[in-house]
Protein backbone atom coordinates (compact mmCIF):
# COMPACT_ATOMS: atom_id res chain seq x y z
CA UNK A 1 0.00 0.00 0.00
CA UNK A 2 1.37 3.41 -0.96
CA UNK A 3 1.45 5.79 1.99
CA UNK A 4 0.26 8.18 3.17
CA UNK A 5 -3.47 7.99 2.66
CA UNK A 6 -5.68 10.47 4.45
CA UNK A 7 -9.35 9.96 5.21
CA UNK A 8 -11.57 12.83 6.33
CA UNK A 9 -14.68 11.81 8.22
CA UNK A 10 -17.09 12.75 11.00
CA UNK A 11 -17.92 11.33 14.40
CA UNK A 12 -21.00 12.01 16.56
CA UNK A 13 -19.73 13.34 19.89
CA UNK A 14 -22.13 13.49 22.81
CA UNK A 15 -21.62 14.49 26.40
CA UNK A 16 -20.64 11.75 28.84
CA UNK A 17 -23.86 12.11 30.87
CA UNK A 18 -26.17 12.02 27.82
CA UNK A 19 -27.68 8.52 27.62
CA UNK A 20 -30.18 9.37 24.86
CA UNK A 21 -27.62 10.70 22.38
CA UNK A 22 -29.56 13.92 21.83
CA UNK A 23 -27.05 16.43 23.22
CA UNK A 24 -24.10 16.34 20.87
CA UNK A 25 -22.69 17.39 17.55
CA UNK A 26 -20.66 16.06 14.64
CA UNK A 27 -16.90 16.54 14.83
CA UNK A 28 -14.77 16.53 11.68
CA UNK A 29 -11.45 14.73 11.91
CA UNK A 30 -8.72 13.44 9.62
CA UNK A 31 -7.01 10.05 9.81
CA UNK A 32 -3.52 9.50 8.40
CA UNK A 33 -3.88 5.85 7.41
CA UNK A 34 -1.03 3.38 7.95
CA UNK A 35 -3.10 0.38 6.86
CA UNK A 36 -6.65 -0.77 6.26
CA UNK A 37 -6.92 -4.01 8.21
CA UNK A 38 -10.45 -4.99 7.20
CA UNK A 39 -13.95 -3.82 6.42
CA UNK A 40 -17.59 -4.87 6.38
CA UNK A 41 -20.74 -3.52 4.76
CA UNK A 42 -23.48 -2.48 7.18
CA UNK A 43 -25.77 -1.27 4.39
CA UNK A 44 -25.40 0.18 0.87
CA UNK A 45 -24.91 3.60 2.48
CA UNK A 46 -22.54 2.54 5.28
CA UNK A 47 -19.20 0.75 5.01
CA UNK A 48 -17.15 0.18 8.17
CA UNK A 49 -13.35 0.30 7.78
CA UNK A 50 -10.88 -1.07 10.31
CA UNK A 51 -8.01 1.42 10.06
CA UNK A 52 -4.61 1.60 11.70
CA UNK A 53 -3.32 5.18 11.80
CA UNK A 54 -3.38 8.49 13.61
CA UNK A 55 -6.50 10.65 13.90
CA UNK A 56 -6.36 14.43 14.13
CA UNK A 57 -9.03 16.96 15.02
CA UNK A 58 -9.29 19.14 11.90
CA UNK A 59 -9.85 22.55 13.50
CA UNK A 60 -6.59 22.71 15.44
CA UNK A 61 -4.42 19.76 14.27
CA UNK A 62 -4.45 18.24 17.78
CA UNK A 63 -4.34 14.45 18.06
CA UNK A 64 -7.92 13.20 18.43
CA UNK A 65 -7.30 11.59 21.86
CA UNK A 66 -6.11 14.93 23.23
CA UNK A 67 -9.26 16.55 21.84
CA UNK A 68 -11.53 13.81 23.26
CA UNK A 69 -9.91 14.04 26.71
CA UNK A 70 -11.47 17.50 27.02
CA UNK A 71 -14.90 15.83 26.89
CA UNK A 72 -14.30 12.44 28.53
CA UNK A 73 -12.27 10.97 31.35
CA UNK A 74 -9.08 9.76 29.57
CA UNK A 75 -8.96 6.68 31.81
CA UNK A 76 -12.19 5.47 30.18
CA UNK A 77 -11.05 5.89 26.55
Language model features with spans:
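Acidic, Ser/Thr- and proline-rich intrinsically disordered linker/docking segments
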Residues: 1-31, 35-77
Amino acid sequence: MIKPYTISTQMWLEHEDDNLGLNGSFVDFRVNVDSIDGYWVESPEEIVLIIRGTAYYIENEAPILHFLSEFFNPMRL
